[in-house]
């Protein structure tokens, strides 16, 4: 049986290194998490939230799914948003997509993928409502545009949740950001920001 010993060894080396540099790190971490940020991103293994924004464990609360989709029937995602806003009292929600996203590629294709097609329906709707913006573009430009448009659409969905609307009505300091990440160069790009003063 493969027990993934190499990963356990990696963990031990990592924990030892952290303690050598900061002996109280895990003691502090075990007290309570108090992140200022909620990151909602893609499940893609190349897009690791903490590393991309260079934050330590405990500094960012993370939720990931295929193609960073936020829909009002996904109680997993909604529960994460509610906990982050109401219990952790995060100040920022970051919706981060990325170029060359496999979920976005699949949504652009015209063949069946199985159960994931139900999830990709939300992205296909973005295409359907913006058909004219994709006319005349080659496949790569369509893909990049859809990756960006999907981020903006999901930011709108976050802003329209009852959780965020309630927070804004209560005067809570909460800003929702839409970013996109380039796997080719490791750089984030800002696309959109909304707060309680925005009209979404």
Question: Residue ranges of each PLM-predicted region?
Answer:
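N-terminal short beta-loop-beta anion/metal-coordinating cradle
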Residues: 18-59
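Divalent-metal-activated hydrolytic enzyme cores
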Residues: 1-35, 67-91, 102-200
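Short beta-strand segments
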Residues: 40-42, 64, 94-98, 177-182
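Active-site cofactor/substrate anionic-group-binding motifs, chiefly glycine-
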Residues: 46-80
């Amino acid at each position: 049986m493969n027990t993934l010993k190499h990963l356990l060894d990696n963990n031990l080396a990592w924990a030892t290194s952290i303690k050598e540099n900061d002996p109280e790190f895990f003691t502090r971490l075990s007290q309570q998490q108090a992140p200022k940020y909620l990151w909602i991103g893609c499940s893609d293994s190349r897009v690791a939230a903490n590393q991309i924004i260079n934050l330590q464990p405990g500094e960012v609360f993370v939720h990931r799914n295929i193609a960073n989709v936020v829909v009002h029937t996904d109680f997993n995602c909604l529960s994460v948003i509610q906990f982050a806003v109401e219990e952790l009292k995060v100040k920022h929600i970051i919706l981060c997509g990325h170029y060359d996203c496999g979920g976005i590629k699949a949504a652009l294709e015209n063949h069946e993928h199985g159960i994931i097609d139900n999830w990709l329906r939300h992205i296909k709707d973005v295409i359907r409502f913006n058909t004219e913006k994709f006319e005349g573009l080659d496949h790569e430009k369509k893909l990049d545009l859809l990756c960006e448009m999907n981020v903006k659409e999901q930011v709108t969905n976050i802003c329209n949740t009852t959780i965020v609307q309630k927070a804004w009505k209560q005067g809570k300091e909460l800003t929702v950001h839409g970013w996109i990440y380039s796997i080719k160069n490791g750089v984030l790009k800002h696309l959109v920001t909304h707060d309680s003063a925005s009209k979404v």
